[in-house]
Amino acid sequence: MGRLISVSFGLLVVFLSLSGTGAALNCASGWSGYDQHCYKVFDKPKSWADAEKFCKKQTSGGHLVSFHSSEETDFVVKLVSQTLESQILWMGLSKVWNQCDWGWSNGAKLKYKAWAEESYCVYFSSTKKGWRSRACRLLGHFVCKSPA
């Protein structure tokens, strides 16, 4: 009986230590899971377009990160702060060419908003609230997101 309790406790410790690392969501090694998605911070700066292409190559369904709630934003900002110091990070929001609508790089409509100002490609910071825009050609770090 004591051995069964010991083994059960050991399995519980392993499960709890893996929670939040993406293991429970079946994320690839080095990726972190939240709400049915996997996330990874990349610290090699790229232009917005190059970062989006890079994310698409990483996993099936991969794109630059899109935010759909303040809780998801908080999760990603915490993930970034564990990896990088204060940096500009691209996210998947840009002005859809020849349209007046903003859209996420994964095709989702923009519903949740946190604008600080307006322009073409959008970034966020791990230390400043709100979204900001800048020329898409400029380099920035980025976070990729994919379905779990």
Swiss-Prot record:
Domain C-type lectin, residue spans: 34-145
Tissue occurrence: Expressed by the venom gland.
A GO cellular component annotation in the UniProt record: extracellular region
Disulfide bonds: 27-38, 55-144, 121-136
Pfam families per record: Lectin_C
Signal peptide: 1-24
Record key words, sorted: Disulfide bond, Hemostasis impairing toxin, Secreted, Signal, Toxin
One of the record's GO molecular function terms: toxin activity
Subcellular location: Secreted
Main location as per UniProt: secreted
SMART domains noted in UniProt: CLECT (SM00034)
Protein family per UniProt: Belongs to the snaclec family.
Further comment: Shows greater sequence similarity to the beta than alpha subunits compared to other heterodimer snaclecs.
Function field: Interferes with one step of hemostasis (modulation of platelet aggregation, or coagulation cascade, for example).
UniProt-listed PANTHER family: MANNOSE, PHOSPHOLIPASE, LECTIN RECEPTOR RELATED
Assembly notes: Heterodimer; disulfide-linked.
Protein name in the entry: Snaclec B2
